[in-house]
Amino acid sequence: MHAPDRRSALPAAIAQRLRLPLIAAPMLRISGVDLVTAVCRAGAIGAFPTANAGSVEELDAWLTRIERNVAELGRPAAPHCPNLIIRQPRFKDDLACLVRHRVEMVITSVGSPAAAVQPLHDVGCLVFADIASLRHAEKAIEAGADGLILLTAGAGGQTGWANPFAFVRAVRAMFDGPVVLAGGVTDGTALAAARLLGCDLAYMGTRFIAARESMASDAYRRMLVDSTLDDIMLTKAFTGLDASLLRPSIVAAGLDPANLDESVSEARAREKFGGKNDAGGPRRWIEVWSAGHSVSGVHAVTGAADIVDEIAAQYRLAFEIGAA
């Protein structure tokens, strides 16, 4: 079920197994075995940060469980896609684990993909690199990335700044490989628009936080259902970098959104909100929650397969209307 007027740059071995050109975005403390399995079985790509597993041994167990779970479907499922954070202590060990499992796709973030590309290519794995600027795109292409994930304004958590229309078209002028749009994709209509814009896939994160299979708390899910676009706050206060967070969660944590320190450094933000000491403030991602502009599309807590079903119907209708 893809845009009829644009060929996908994805390899056929992957594209043919997708019901939708969609990645359930890898989200810290949210994406785990159950969510990834449900999404892959429903026909979309399920992604997760390797850092969500507490150790490399747990990561190995997670991958084994996901592989077994999707195999039980009895037919080819959509791929699962680990997200490898480059600048983290477990990078080499996590990379080696992914190589042992011969995963089909990996997303790299927070740093150049260069150190990961060759080992992953050696086992036939596609490498997608997170980028937030044209310079990032150039560097990722030079490093050998197979695909680019464009982090744009409206993405939840650590976010981008660029307008998605301008960013996608500028990247398409220099790169003909797979492009993924990340930020503000609310439903199947937006997914269809991303395909027409020139993307091969799109991220959807916020919608899947509210899925029953996510690792989010019930309170987090309820807040997503109760929130709209106007409840998203762009702030540097908790990470030292721009992040899209739920304003109601900041208030619930006892802070005044109008009086946050927007000049804080990454190190100081980590000290205050990273949860490493008792003197700090509320823990980011645990007590202060992220969401993207697509939060207005979260209307209920449902299963991941139900979300994929809804998006698929909207996606199909969007192209039927466009063809009329």
Located regions from the model:
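Conserved active-site-proximal phosphate/metal-binding subdomains
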Residues: 164-180, 186-324
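Residue-level detector of alpha-helix initiation sites
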Residues: 30, 185-186
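Active-site entrance/lid segments in N-terminal catalytic domains of soluble metabolic enzymes
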Residues: 1-178
